[in-house]
Amino acid sequence: MNPYEQYMQELAQQMRAELTENGFESLETSEDVSNYMKNVNEEDTTFVVINSTCGCAAGLARPAAVAVAEQNDKKPTNKITVFAGQDKEATQTMREYIQQVPSSPSYALFKGTELKHFIPREHIEGRDIQDICMDIKDAFDENC
């Protein structure tokens, strides 16, 4: 592994921990994603965070996801994450389930394997964190 790859891996580990330390399951391989989606209960809701190393993920996407997932009255059954740019195959497989234009960071909310709500990067970047939290809250309130 070259120094750049090592640096990015170490950086990503900290960014991944922001979610996993708050109850998100990290799916790091294509098989992890496929197995999860094949075995999810059709009545369960799953909140997916497509993580990223960009500034809007650090300052907006991860903090908003954690805050709403912890504090909202209605919560998804499951919380998972894949890391764009780091876990490329896992991210690609998740995007096949999402079936939207690739976007990171982004959020997806599923009921079973059916996509119920998607929030792309363009609805995260440059916005106020409270507005992002309200978007997530509204999706949870409607679908969880």
Curated annotation (Swiss-Prot):
Stored InterPro entries: BrxB/BrxA (IPR009474)
GO biological process, one term: cell redox homeostasis
Domain of life: Bacteria
UniProt record similarity statement: Belongs to the bacilliredoxin family.
Protein name, as recorded: Bacilliredoxin SH1478
